């Protein structure tokens, strides 16, 4: 059912309420209500975006300018495709010769302007395959990867940090000089070594939390800009 809720401007916004159903836990019902009433979810549905996560990348790029026409981009953990959509539009990728390549072990529908690989990024063959399909080194490496949550905050943080570190190692090994790296992490206090690695290899490194990332979420993004080049990485 829906219920009218007054907005600050005097307009009315319909708020969706989920009826109580046998077998549906109250926590699941609250999550579903929040999801259905999320303005970013509604915006994604109306604008044809694959997920609300697309707006996280849009907001980060609007502020930090990491994507530009003509760039080549690799998107790690691409499913369901929201970031690929944003990247392809931002770099003006040609559907006939995509300059955006996404990879995920989950199946996802094709994204215009992006090539999609269904394979595990941690597969030994994945890095070479990504560069082969892209046709050269990327200007930007994106990673919205997160390990499946267990409900144990410390464990979830450590598992996602492992993915973030793997993404950072990959970015350092393939990026063009001057390139950018953006990756999801969780607040948890164990990312010191990763930050040190990135600061040695990029001229600017900091955390960002876009408005589309929920306030109660422990999710953060690490943004590393202006890659110093392979010589710095090997030094």
From Swiss-Prot:
Residues 1-29 are annotated as: Disordered. S-adenosyl-L-methionine binds at residues 81, 83, 104, 120, 144. Residues 14-28 have a biased composition (Basic residues). GO terms for cellular component: cytoplasm. The active site is at residue 184. One of its GO terms (molecular function) is rRNA (uridine-2'-O-)-methyltransferase activity. Pfam families: FtsJ. HAMAP family: RNA_methyltr_E (MF_01547). This is Ribosomal RNA large subunit methyltransferase E. The gene is rlmE.
